[in-house]
């Protein structure tokens, strides 16, 4: 059995980096546990540019250096999957309402993620990859993750 792989939705990363309440504490606990190696945390390459844009308030030049530093800090314990033509083509051929969510779903399939951690679970309804919020993820870890992980 391999280590659990969790793909982070952008909203979870923003909750952590911006200390956004009331979600920050759970996102912080998630990041701490990932940092000490309890499981592997992932984001996609497309999320990196989204995060830079959002965290720098639309790309304000004065905020870019600090934003880069924050994401570099995140990179010390979060892996990045390089989105390829495969994921892009699957997203473009999909009928999902939100292309960004579909792309993240395709990344989850490509890295064989055990779950997507998000606050918007309805955006990821699928039997192929479970979508969990932070609380559900920790509950799942304690209860049945050892019997259902991939690899």
In which residue ranges do the predicted regions lie?
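Active-site-proximal, substrate-binding regions of enzyme catalytic domains
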Residues: 28-31, 35, 40, 46-96, ...
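Alpha-helix N-cap/helix-start and coil->helix boundary motif
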Residues: 48-49, 110, 138
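Short loop/helix-cap segments at secondary-structure boundaries that form the rim of catalytic
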Residues: 121-129
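Short, well-structured N-terminal submotif of metal-dependent ribonuclease cores
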Residues: 1-43, 59-63, 126, 138-151
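Active-site regions of enzymes building and remodeling cell-envelope glycoconjugates
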Residues: 128-136
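Active-site neighborhoods of divalent-metal-dependent phosphate/nucleic-acid chemistry enzymes
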Residues: 76-121, 148-150
